[in-house]
């Protein structure tokens, strides 16, 4: 009797089990997020590798080191020396330094950060990549490339992006310098990833690239946590990761689909290697993004456990690949996209997306057939159970009503505290999830009070199964339509399997319960009884008439009443007059424990899977609202996700007990109220503004806060703005972002021996034969422009009207007036319709102070040709990104005095903002540099 009472479908039993499920999910989540922190190496090699890597990280990242800075050269030299020390006694290792070999190229490149862009871009790039080749014991095997970039953004020390990747490569180099690998390894310590993935692109100009087949790219798009397998090229490479990374695997193909479908706007060197036909892995830190590309991406915000997770993951993977031959890696390669995920960091699953497609097809056909077959049997023998009252409409009405309230609550949060998700998305997620569950519990309980049902949970499970069938059918079609690249749909497959299986099991139990239905002429109460028909009829009549006959025999004690029946409504124990049939007979052969099987099938794993998937997505996108300002997309994910997490619980929601219901209600209200009241930005979770000084104007952009004054208030509080009474002008960029502009302080970008006489940038036309009488009207127009810049590495040239008629550009870099100091590189346009929109210039030598750009374009061939028809407007923009060192300026002293030496901040306006900004604000660069000087002209 006690056993039966515990495991029957009662409020207490259900509540305890549901609480246990939520508690276990919370524990698993906590373990998954923190276990890596307690997994530091204990073996001597691992300890040494980590200690050396941490010291390297400290040495590399003590200052910002973008490609445009002199500090970038210091990092290059440090790496070159460290590599030389590591491989000093390694006979099978060889170094190639692009800086020393003057590696450079002029090539066409699509905008790597905007896949929809159709702009024709030509890139001139001088490389300072450092390459190391470790010859394998078997030279026949294709090489493995290990890659990371050592440049940072101008506003960041680059600890995670990508210092950890670089020092992990040094650690791998140290490991393989002691044991020669079977397969040749090529290390690419590349430069200038941040503004075009250029170091990875020019790698393919090197002879060592010709034998490479596999690659591992190490990257950072957040500043800590665990290093995730963002994406991998195919199923075979996913299985290699599965077979090699046994300690703390972490990856999910949901992120891979995000890249495939361009939900993730940024890019890494992985894209370059993949486009060149290599096969490999993109391993990266991905959160938090609010400190990413800021001065806070520093040692102080990093940790050895985070570094070790990337280092150890890449070590496991590279050792596995390096020691296996092609046969061991698999002669039959599956090149289809992979579906993969880890289970709380304990194991890793990988299957082909094509296989998932056929699994889905089979499920979409077979499962409905089984369900329809079982349903028809239930309908034939126990039709009254599944056809009773409004049982089929309860869940849709309840879910839609609750969903409407969830949407309203979500909009309320977005209105009152829109950027709370940037700080904490778990609070609103938990609040909305429990709100949806409790609302459904109240509504479904009300339905049960009005019209008691025999087995609502089975009907509800099958309704949810049908919903997942529709979703899965659509996602399967999208999977096929997108060339099997929708690799993040596997949660719907798994949820449909468990829902359909549980629903069919419920139908089986209904079949074998052998329930008979007869009419009760005096009342229409539903009562579930044993075989004592006459006893029950008498008892029900007594209840209806308000009598309690205690003289019945002892058998009546085993008959369930409204007070203790597991199918009794939640809100009341009273007996209502309900117009429906009375169930009078149920076989004792099947006990009412089927709910446990259905619950364990439906709730625990589905809830954990859906929560884990949503948490991964929100972890990646919650702080992108500061970059894109797209609040609607992120809140839409939050609302839909909270509903999805709740769905597995809905069939059992009407049995949630009073105490658990109150607890969930209290938690929900508390989380939602805190979400609306909590400050969205703190010192550890700051708001990010982006800085750029364009000529003499400072432009700072950022998201629009609730009071719309944070950006303006910060600028108005700057000493220079108050002292000089500078006018601050702000305008809206999008609905959720704005840009403010004010007069900046003069920059001091270079050491100046002749104060006020040195021009930082000057554009001079050396040649232009557009109006020359010696040129035939049908001949191409040629022009040559010199861009004179001081201590500069990066300029862009934009072409305006008639840019589609440009047929050729050539670039040379000269030092002083020596035109023979550089060989010109030429690029010809083959497609007559495209022309050239933009020419990007990236040079290494600071002392080479001139870019010479030659341009050739076709004239407009018309009968009445006006002079203006053939003009070519150009705009030149040059960038500087170094600010931490002071500049020295020398001027004349007073009459009869000597020279006056003064020290200045290179970019005073930027230094001022870093000094006086609020603690809950961080600053990032807006473009390639912190300062941009521009000049326009017409050729």
UniProtKB/Swiss-Prot annotation:
The record's free-text note on cofactor binding: Binds 2 Zn(2+) ions per subunit.
Keyword Transmembrane helix in record: yes
Membrane topology of this protein: Multi-pass membrane protein
Ranges for region Disordered: 540-561
Gene Ontology CC entries for this record: fungal-type vacuole membrane
Positions glycosylated per UniProt: 59, 88, 114, 326, 622, 810, 820
Topological domains annotated Vacuolar: 33-356, 410-424, 475-491, 610-636, 685-939
Family from the record: Belongs to the peptidase M28 family.
Name of the protein in question: Vacuolar membrane protease
UniProt source species: Vanderwaltozyma polyspora (strain ATCC 22028 / DSM 70294 / BCRC 21397 / CBS 2163 / NBRC 10782 / NRRL Y-8283 / UCD 57-17)
Organism phylogeny: Eukaryota, Fungi, Dikarya, Ascomycota, Saccharomycotina
């Amino acid at each position: 009797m006690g056993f039966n009472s515990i495991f029957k479908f009662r409020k207490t039993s259900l509540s305890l089990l549901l609480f246990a499920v939520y508690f276990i999910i919370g524990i698993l989540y906590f373990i998954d997020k923190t276990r890596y922190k307690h997994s530091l190496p204990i073996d001597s090699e691992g300890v040494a590798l980590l200690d050396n890597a941490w010291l390297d990280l400290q040495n590399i990242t003590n200052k910002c080191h973008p490609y445009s800075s002199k500090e970038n050269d210091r990092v290059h030299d440090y790496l070159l020396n460290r590599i030389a020390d590591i491989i000093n006694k390694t006979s099978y290792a060889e170094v190639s330094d692009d800086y020393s070999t003057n590696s450079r190229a002029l090539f066409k490149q699509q905008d790597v950060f905007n896949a929809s862009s159709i702009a024709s871009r030509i890139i001139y790039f001088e490389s300072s990549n450092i390459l190391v080749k470790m010859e394998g014991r078997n030279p026949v095997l294709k090489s493995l490339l290990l890659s990371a970039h050592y440049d940072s953004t101008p506003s960041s020390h680059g600890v995670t992006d990508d210092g950890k990747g670089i020092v992990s490569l040094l650690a791998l180099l140290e490991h393989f310098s002691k044991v020669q690998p079977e397969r040749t390894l090529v290390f690419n310590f590349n430069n200038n990833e941040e503004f075009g993935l250029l170091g990875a692109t020019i790698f393919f100009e090197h002879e060592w690239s010709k034998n490479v087949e596999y690659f591992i790219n190490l990257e950072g798009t957040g500043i800590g946590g665990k290093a995730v397998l963002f994406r991998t090229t195919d199923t075979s490479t996913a299985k290699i990761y599965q077979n090699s990374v046994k300690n703390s695997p972490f990856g999910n193909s949901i992120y891979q689909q995000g890249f495939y479908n361009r939900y993730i706007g940024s890019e890494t060197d992985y894209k370059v290697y993949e486009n060149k036909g290599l096969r490999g892995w993109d391993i990266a830190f991905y959160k938090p993004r609010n400190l990413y590309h800021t001065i806070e991406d520093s040692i102080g915000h990093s940790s050895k456990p985070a570094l070790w997770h990337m280092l150890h993951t890449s070590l496991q993977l590279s050792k596995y690949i390096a020691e296996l031959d092609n046969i061991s890696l698999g002669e039959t390669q599956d090149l289809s996209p992979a579906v993969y995920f880890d289970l709380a960091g304990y194991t890793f699953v990988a299957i082909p997306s094509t296989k998932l497609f056929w699994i889905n097809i089979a499920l979409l056909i077979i499962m409905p057939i089984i369900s329809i077959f079982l349903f028809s049997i239930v309908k034939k023998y126990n039709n009254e159970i599944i056809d009773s009252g409004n049982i089929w409409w309860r869940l849709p009405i309840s879910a839609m009503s609750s969903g409407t309230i969830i949407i309203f609550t979500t909009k309320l949060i977005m209105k009152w505290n829109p950027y709370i998700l940037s700080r904490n998305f778990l609070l609103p997620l938990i609040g909305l999830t429990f709100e949806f569950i409790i609302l459904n519990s109240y509504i479904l309980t009300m339905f049960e009070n009005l019209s008691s049902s025999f087995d609502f949970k089975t009907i509800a499970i099958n309704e949810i199964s049908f919903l997942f069938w529709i979703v899965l059918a659509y996602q399967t079609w999208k999977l096929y339509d997108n060339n099997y690249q929708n690799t993040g749909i596997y949660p719907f497959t798994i949820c449909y399997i468990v829902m359909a299986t549980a629903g069919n099991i419920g139908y089986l139990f209904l079949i074998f319960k052998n329930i008979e239905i007869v009419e009760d002429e005096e009342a229409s109460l539903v009562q579930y009884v044993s075989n004592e028909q006459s006893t029950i009829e008498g008892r029900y009549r007594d209840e209806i008439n308000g009598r309690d006959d205690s003289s019945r025999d002892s058998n009546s004690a085993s008959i369930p009443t409204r007070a203790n029946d597991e199918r009794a409504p939640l809100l009341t124990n009273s007996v209502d007059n309900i117009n429906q049939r009375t169930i009078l007979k149920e076989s004792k052969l099947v006990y009412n424990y089927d709910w446990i099987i259905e619950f364990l099938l439906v709730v625990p794993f589905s809830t954990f899977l859906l929560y884990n998937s949503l948490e991964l997505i929100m972890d990646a996108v919650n702080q992108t609202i500061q970059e894109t300002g797209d609040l609607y997309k992120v809140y839409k994910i939050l609302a839909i996700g909270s509903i999805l997490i709740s769905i597995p619980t809905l069939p059992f929601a009407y049995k949630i007990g009073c105490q658990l219901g109150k607890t969930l209600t209290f938690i929900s209200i508390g989380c939602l109220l805190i979400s609306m009241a909590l400050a969205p930005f703190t010192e550890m979770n700051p708001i990010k503004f982006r800085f750029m000084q364009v000529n003499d104007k400072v432009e700072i952009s950022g998201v629009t806060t609730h009071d719309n004054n944070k950006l303006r208030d910060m600028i108005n509080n700057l000493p220079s703005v108050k002292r000089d009474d500078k006018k601050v002008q702000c305008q809206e960029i999008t609905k959720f972002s704005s840009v403010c502009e004010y007069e900046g302080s003069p920059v001091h970008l270079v050491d100046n021996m002749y104060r006020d006489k040195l021009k930082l940038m000057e554009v001079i036309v050396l040649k232009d034969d557009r109006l020359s009488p010696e040129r035939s009207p049908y001949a191409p127009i040629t022009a040559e422009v010199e861009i004179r810049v001081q201590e500069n590495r990066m300029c862009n040239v934009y072409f305006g009207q008639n840019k589609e008629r440009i047929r050729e550009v050539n670039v040379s870099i000269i030092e002083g007036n020596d035109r023979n100091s550089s060989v010109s590189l030429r690029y010809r346009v083959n497609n007559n319709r495209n022309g050239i929109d933009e020419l990007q210039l990236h040079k290494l030598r600071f002392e080479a102070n001139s870019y010479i750009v030659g341009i050739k374009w076709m004239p407009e061939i018309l009968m009445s040709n006006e002079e203006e028809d053939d003009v070519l407007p150009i705009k030149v923009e040059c960038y500087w990104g170094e600010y931490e060192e002071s500049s020295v300026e020398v001027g004349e002293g007073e009459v009869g005095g000597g020279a006056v030496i003064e020290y200045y901040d290179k970019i005073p306006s930027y230094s001022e903002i870093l000094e006086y900004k609020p603690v809950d604000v961080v600053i990032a660069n807006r473009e390639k540099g912190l300062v941009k000087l521009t000049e326009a002209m017409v050729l």
